[in-house]
């Protein structure tokens, strides 16, 4: 039997860093007598902008790196109590590695917030769609895996079959191409749970109807338009909350998971 363990949330990592990792590395690097402290703000920035993992191994290594540089300042530069702040953290660790994109503030045409579950937790996965003159071709970009590409084609088939009820020109595929893109193209993405997101993004692009910027969704789409349940609901909802999303659409089949 395989038991799946959820990744730590950011606030959990912060508490672990405050209570255990930072004190351990401060002592290990001989800084305990120098009254060195790493503030909550500094640790939070390290967690969110310099590490991206399910556990805290890289987090501890990153904190250790900061402590080693402070120890160097004490020994070589005769600075009795080095001060690390949010403003000068880059002097110890370089430029931030991970910078979360800001949420769109206004409703957009062809732009929908999806939700994904990765090895490091839940993430908001924006989906963009646009149309152009063509012959019904569907382009799917953003380093998408085979399953996610199949979801895009299933969404396209559903839209073509239901064009009339969706108030879309039934012959749109004869004169338009559709391009669906999931940003951060260097990051591989896969799985079926973005099906409903891609469907709505394409419908929005074809109808010109805007989608709320504070709305997110997740679910696998079938050719008949059914939205199937997905995994990682807890992690996805937490990601949506941190992103500033006010409402999330989930499959009916996941209703049983909400109490968790």
Where is each model-derived feature located?
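Aromatic side chains
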Residues: 8, 20, 50, 92, ...
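Walker A/P-loop NTP-binding motif of AAA+ ATPase domains
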Residues: 1-7, 228-229
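Conserved catalytic-core segments of large NTP-driven translation/proteostasis enzymes
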Residues: 39-144
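Conserved C-terminal "switch" segment of AAA+ ATPases
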Residues: 6-64, 69-82, 165-175, 209-214
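Peripheral, non-AAA+ core regions of ATP-driven protein-machinery
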Residues: 81, 102-103, 108-113, 121-260
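Residues immediately C-terminal
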Residues: 2, 65, 223
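Broad structural signal for hydrophobic residues in well-ordered alpha-helices, predominantly aliphatic
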Residues: 25, 89, 202-203
């Amino acid at each position: 039997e395989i038991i799946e363990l959820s990744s730590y949330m950011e606030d959990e990592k912060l508490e672990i860093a405050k209570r255990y990792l930072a004190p351990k590395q401060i002592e290990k690097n001989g800084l305990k007598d120098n009254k060195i402290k790493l503030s909550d703000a500094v640790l939070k920035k390290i967690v969110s902008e310099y590490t991206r993992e399910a556990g805290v191994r890289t987090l501890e290594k990153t904190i250790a790196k900061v402590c080693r540089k402070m120890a160097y300042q004490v020994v070589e530069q005769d600075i009795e109590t080095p001060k690390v702040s949010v403003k000068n953290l880059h002097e110890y660790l370089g430029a931030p590695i991970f910078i979360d994109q800001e949420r769109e503030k206004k409703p957009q045409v062809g732009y929908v917030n999806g939700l994904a579950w990765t090895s490091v937790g839940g993430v908001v996965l924006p989906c963009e769609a646009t149309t152009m003159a063509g012959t019904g071709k569907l382009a799917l970009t953003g380093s998408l895996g085979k399953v996610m590409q199949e979801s895009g084609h299933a969404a396209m088939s559903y839209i073509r079959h239901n064009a009339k009820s969706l108030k879309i020109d039934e012959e749109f595929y004869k004169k338009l191409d559709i391009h669906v893109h999931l940003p951060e193209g260097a990051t591989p993405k896969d799985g079926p749970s973005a099906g409903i997101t891609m469907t709505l993004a394409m419908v929005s692009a074809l109808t010109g109807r805007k989608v709320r910027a504070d709305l997110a969704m997740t679910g696998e789409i079938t050719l008949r338009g059914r939205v199937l349940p997905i995994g990682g609901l807890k992690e996805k909802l937490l990601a949506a909350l941190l992103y500033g999303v006010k409402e999330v659409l989930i499959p009916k089949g996941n209703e049983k998971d909400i109490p968790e």
